[in-house]
Amino acid sequence: IYRYMKLEDAIKYYKDAFNDFDSDKAAKLLGKLGLKLNQKISQCSKGMLEQIHMVLALSRSSDVYIFDEPLAAVDPLTRDDIMEMIKSERKKESIVFISTHLISDVESLFDSIIMVKDGKVILHDNVQSLKKENKADLETIFKEKLR
């Protein structure tokens, strides 16, 4: 999306670019986040831009979603809204990849986790069995693996 656009322009742009894009869903989700369709993207904060990109991605019927630090620039309440949106609005049976340093915030979203250090996978496991085996949360496990 381009900064000169309004949100309604971004929705039209995605609708034209992707045949699996649901413009009604995008408008509904933007409204749930308190964003107005006539709002200019240039007037959006970094956190708002994260939300807009999340909505645009989740408004596609995709088998795989990839998000890079989607929670980094948002306040805690918006973070909760985004997490709930990922849970409820993604295509069922889809795969969601999230790269994040906010491990404790996304822990409840996943069935499995891949931890990467220096571009190499250092751990790939089921979240519940990993937590049970280590008797710790994912952030603690991650810190131990990085040492």
Features from the language model and the residues they span:
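A short, surface-exposed alpha-helical micro-motif characterized by mixed small hydrophobic
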Residues: 106-108
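Conserved H-loop
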Residues: 93-102
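ABC-family P-loop ATPase nucleotide-binding domains
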Residues: 1-52
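Catalytic Walker B motif of ABC-type/P-loop ATPase nucleotide-binding domains
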Residues: 65-69, 74
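Helical segment within the ABC ATPase nucleotide-binding domain
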Residues: 79-92
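ABC ATPase "signature
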Residues: 124-125
